[in-house]
Swiss-Prot record:
This is Holliday junction branch migration complex subunit RuvA. Homotetramer. Forms an RuvA(8)-RuvB(12)-Holliday junction (HJ) complex. HJ DNA is sandwiched between 2 RuvA tetramers; dsDNA enters through RuvA and exits via RuvB. An RuvB hexamer assembles on each DNA strand where it exits the tetramer. Each RuvB hexamer is contacted by two RuvA subunits (via domain III) on 2 adjacent RuvB subunits; this complex drives branch migration. In the full resolvosome a probable DNA-RuvA(4)-RuvB(12)-RuvC(2) complex forms which resolves the HJ. Residues 150-203 are annotated as: Domain III. The RuvA-RuvB-RuvC complex processes Holliday junction (HJ) DNA during genetic recombination and DNA repair, while the RuvA-RuvB complex plays an important role in the rescue of blocked DNA replication forks via replication fork reversal (RFR). RuvA specifically binds to HJ cruciform DNA, conferring on it an open structure. The RuvB hexamer acts as an ATP-dependent pump, pulling dsDNA into and through the RuvAB complex. HJ branch migration allows RuvC to scan DNA until it finds its consensus sequence, where it cleaves and resolves the cruciform DNA. CDD domains: UBA_RuvA_C. It comes from the Bacteria. GO terms for cellular component: cytoplasm; Holliday junction helicase complex; Holliday junction resolvase complex. Has three domains with a flexible linker between the domains II and III and assumes an 'L' shape. Domain III is highly mobile and contacts RuvB. Residues 143-149 are annotated as: Flexible linker. It is found in: Cytoplasm. The gene is ruvA. It comes from Rickettsia africae (strain ESF-5). NCBIfam families: ruvA. GO terms for biological process: DNA recombination; DNA repair. Residues 64-142 are annotated as: Domain II.
Length: 203
């Protein structure tokens, strides 16, 4: 999976940026805070979170790993998806979120449009233990860095994507390993498509 993009900002929208990498334009969704720091024509390095679904592949970009980690943490809360996670990160920095959760300050989250009292309470309750462990060099940060590491063999993210598409974890692991053994240079897109095609042909 794509873990990082380095390129020139070609264009920006309300919730996305197009990064030109060697003539290829990647549409990357980002928080308002991140977009506000980008300027067209300038070069940047963005850390990327890739979400794969049967109908699309979405890229989410971050200028620092801390924001990427909190993007994933927020999605661990029941009721928060990618769009809401970015919306919250457009209003609050990771440090703001950490302080609010540790202080059990629900009002910080309730002040964000679209976040009601129940969701604010869930954010505090469900992130309390996780956020408390986050600090520079903590085990959580190290684990998060490893999860999205790009390897030439089956990555956890590819397997997770196939599980989201209906595979059991065992099926996904076997499918990915088998395809890569036959074609080590296969692209991620083709890997997923081939796995889906092979599975459908077996039914």
């Amino acid at each position: 999976m794509i873990g990082q993009l380095s390129g020139k900002v070609d264009a920006q929208g309300d919730d996305y940026v197009i990064i030109d990498v060697n003539g290829v334009g990647y549409l990357v969704y980002a928080s308002g805070k991140t977009l506000g720091k980008l300027a067209e024509g300038e070069f940047y390095k963005l850390f990327i979170e890739t979400h794969v679904r049967e109908e699309h592949i979405h890229l989410y970009g971050f200028l620092n790993l801390e924001e990427k980690i909190f993007f994933n943490l927020l999605q661990s809360v029941n009721g928060i998806g990618t769009r809401m996670a970015l919306f919250i990160l457009s209003s609050l920095t990771p440090s703001d979120i950490q302080i609010a959760v540790n202080n059990e300050d629900k009002n910080i989250f309730k002040a964000i449009s679209g976040v009601g009292a129940k969701l604010a309470e869930r954010i505090v309750l469900e992130l309390k233990g996780k956020v408390a462990k986050i600090s520079s060099g903590s085990a959580i940060i190290k684990e998060s860095l490893n999860i999205k590491h790009i390897t030439p063999v089956a990555s956890n993210e590819v397997i997770k994507a196939l599980v989201n598409l209906g595979f059991s974890r065992f099926e996904a692991q076997n499918a990915v390993q088998g395809i890569i053994t036959q074609n080590p240079e296969i692209s991620i897109d083709e890997l997923i498509k081939t796995a889906l095609k092979n599975r459908n042909s077996n039914f």
